[in-house]
């Protein structure tokens, strides 16, 4: 069995005139990263590999999650190929994962994440929002063979905010 946790990077800032890959988290993104990461500990596998896009906003999201979940920062593997908005490229990267890893936690981007969870999960999600968390379990033993999985947990910042 394989377990995949997809986390969309938190809300980024558009204030500074920087290249897309260099955009940093907005204050709301920082707040939402803390909010979600402080509420998912019980849903996470004990052992895992953590991958993040090399985009600044994804990396900052991953670091906040790591700090709140007490993951060593050096356990985050930053992968250029995760800086993609294309679900077929995301799928290719996931399917290339070593089978010795049962659990993958991935910080990435939309539209790739929403399209991936709708292709491989069993619950339709119109849009995975920033800082959104989706967990999918697959019965296959090989990442390269994953097909239809079961969506086991969905948690979005709006689920944790009370007016």
Where are these regions (language model features)?
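A polyampholytic, Gly/Pro-enriched intrinsically disordered region
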Residues: 95-105, 147-158
């Amino acid at each position: 069995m394989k377990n995949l946790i997809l986390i969309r990077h938190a809300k980024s800032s558009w204030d500074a005139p920087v290249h897309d890959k260099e955009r940093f988290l907005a204050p709301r993104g920082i707040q939402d990263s803390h909010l979600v990461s402080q509420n998912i500990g019980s849903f996470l596998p004990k052992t895992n590999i953590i991958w993040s896009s090399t985009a600044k906003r994804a990396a900052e999201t991953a670091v906040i999650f790591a700090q709140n979940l007490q993951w060593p920062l050096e356990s985050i593997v930053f992968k250029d190929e995760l800086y993609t908005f294309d679900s077929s490229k995301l799928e290719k990267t996931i399917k290339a994962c070593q089978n010795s890893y049962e659990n993958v936690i991935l910080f990435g981007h939309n539209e790739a994440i929403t399209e991936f969870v709708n292709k491989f999960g069993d619950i339709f999600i119109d849009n995975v929002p920033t800082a959104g968390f989706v967990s999918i379990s697959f019965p296959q033993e090989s990442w390269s063979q994953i097909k239809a999985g079961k969506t086991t947990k969905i948690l979005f910042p709006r689920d944790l905010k009370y007016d």
